[in-house]
Curated annotation (Swiss-Prot):
SMART domains: Fe_hyd_SSU (SM00902)
Name of the protein: Probable cytosolic Fe-S cluster assembly factor GG21400
The species this protein was found in: Drosophila erecta
Sequence positions that bind [4Fe-4S] cluster 1: 23, 68, 71, 74
Keyword ATP-binding: no
Binding site for [4Fe-4S] cluster 2: 187, 243, 395, 399
């Protein structure tokens, strides 16, 4: 298991969603079907035997990342799979190999190393090392530069674009009364669960807008590569994320470009993995020289590199889209800070806009697997069709409490840690997605807003894994 990230091996990695203990890999077995399925005994040598009608030695099972994506045995426990290309060991290997090629002047094989850092890991690292959030970004950039990074970026522009695309998609669906309730798509744990468990029933409701990570992948491998005049395959793009499931998302075939022979995101490391790397370096984050983050999208960078998007903690989808839709569809301007009403628990909240006594917009935020299950079951029974949009995140409290965020210190409760991270987030400057820098990317690189090119690069599709599984034998390990 040397290829598995050490952070995944050594910690409790349930990422707040209770995984099924039944991993299913479709294996064709020529035997009669039974009502109970085949029982498998795992042996010490990692082989297993089928023991229903006499013992039968089977081959060793090798589970790749693609097997995991095509499987519905677990829900989101990507972290339990051997993801050899998504570990800090692999990252360090690539960085060292690249430094060696530079030292030997093997310029034809030198890769451009680009890091992209999401906001939530910066909050986690800032709290862990007791420094400011913007400072944590600059010190982290310095650390990555010391490892051999050529560029270090923030996800700000991708966060902005994701909101612009998602809100426009919602307004179009609302006007056409098509595929509502619309469900957010930025959480890979939620998308993986939907594909594996509910298939074609739920998939049309999910927004086609790519997550900020994958939008950033497009910008780096298409836009930035063009600016640098290097092939996309020659760029090694690393993202720093709050969630192990982002590793699975980056590995989807939808995000591999056959034209460029390159993935949009080559490697994902997480907050807790960065902490582990820093621990192994025997230095704290603040001990690395601070370096400004790069801003390759225009000549003038923004005043800050780390921004909040509304007051909600997972990208601000529900809040931002609600405000935009109220103005765009009904010429209503809600208060700058919306108040969501808590329902059965703090992770399920809703907000309503009424006009002439009628409810014209009804949005919700559903965080945590329990609320996701309830939401889907109600959708199937037709009981939540009055919700127009739901922001769905797999982790309780959303991405700020992601399964790969740095763990609480001894004696500190998860709720207390989450509250402190929320305070850090709420003190960040607020980003307006309709800023001139974002508009510049649309005009200069995407042929404008709502163009064929922008849709091709900024949207994705989903797959009914359930129907594929119905063709295979259900095996309990």
């Amino acid at each position: 298991m040397s290829g598995l990230s050490r952070a995944l091996q050594l910690t409790d990695i349930d990422d707040f969603i209770t995984p099924s203990q039944m991993c299913i890999k479709p294996v064709k077995i020529d035997k009669a079907k039974s009502k109970t399925g085949a029982k498998i005994m795992i042996k010490d040598d990692s082989c297993f035997e089928e023991s229903e009608s006499g013992k039968k030695k089977l081959n060793k099972v090798e589970i790749t990342l693609q097997d995991c994506l095509a499987c519905s045995g677990c829900i989101t426990s990507a972290e339990g799979v051997l993801i050899t290309q998504q570990s800090q060991e692999e990252l360090l290997r690539v960085l060292q190999e690249n430094l060696t090629k530079k030292a030997t002047e093997d310029w034809g094989n030198v890769r451009t190393i680009v890091f992209t850092i999401a906001t939530q890991p910066l909050l986690s690292l800032a709290h862990r090392y007791q420094i400011g959030v913007e400072d944590s970004a600059r010190h982290l950039a310095g650390y990555f530069r010391s490892l051999g990074a050529d560029y270090v970026l923030s996800t700000k522009v991708a966060d902005d674009i994701a909101l612009l695309e998602c809100r426009q998609e919602f307004v179009e669906r609302y006007r056409e009364n098509e595929n509502l309730t619309m469900l957010s798509s930025s959480c890979p744990g939620w998308v993986c669960y939907a594909e594996k468990t509910h298939g074609n029933f739920i998939l049309p409701y999910i927004s086609t807008t790519r997550s900020p990570q994958q939008i950033m992948g497009v910008l780096v491998k298409h836009v930035f590569a063009e600016k640098l005049n290097v092939p996309a395959s020659q760029i090694y793009h690393v993202t720093v994320m709050p969630c192990y499931d982002k590793k699975l998302e980056a590995s989807r075939e939808d995000f591999f470009s056959t034209a460029n022979n390159s993935r949009d995101v080559d490697c994902v490391i997480t907050s807790v993995e960065v902490e582990q790397l820093l621990s192994e370096s025997q230095r704290t984050l603040a001990q690395y020289d601070p370096v400004d983050l790069d801003w390759p999208w225009s000549n003038v960078p923004p005043d800050f590199m780390v921004w909040a998007h509304e007051k909600t903690l997972s990208g601000g989808y529900a809040e931002h889209i609600f405000k935009f839709a109220a103005k765009e569809l009904f010429n209503e301007v809600p208060r700058s800070e919306l108040e969501f009403k808590q329902l059965k628990n703090r992770d399920f909240r809703e907000i309503i806009l009424k006009k002439n006594g009628n409810t014209v917009l009804k949005f919700a935020i559903a965080n945590g697997f329990r609320n996701i299950q309830n939401l889907v079951h109600k959708l199937k029974r037709g009981k939540v069709s009055n919700y127009h949009f739901v922001e769905v995140m797999a982790c309780p409290s959303g991405c700020i409490n992601g399964g790969a965020q740095i763990r609480p210190t001894t004696g500190q409760h998860v709720r207390e840690l989450t509250r402190k991270l929320e305070e850090l987030y709420h003190n960040l400057p607020q980003s307006d997605p309709e800023n001139s820098l974002t508009k510049l990317i649309y005009t200069d690189f995407l042929d404008g807003f709502q163009t064929e090119k922008s849709y091709e690069l900024l949207h994705t599709r989903y797959h009914d894994v359930v129907s594929e599984l119905s063709k295979s034998l259900n095996i309990n390990w």
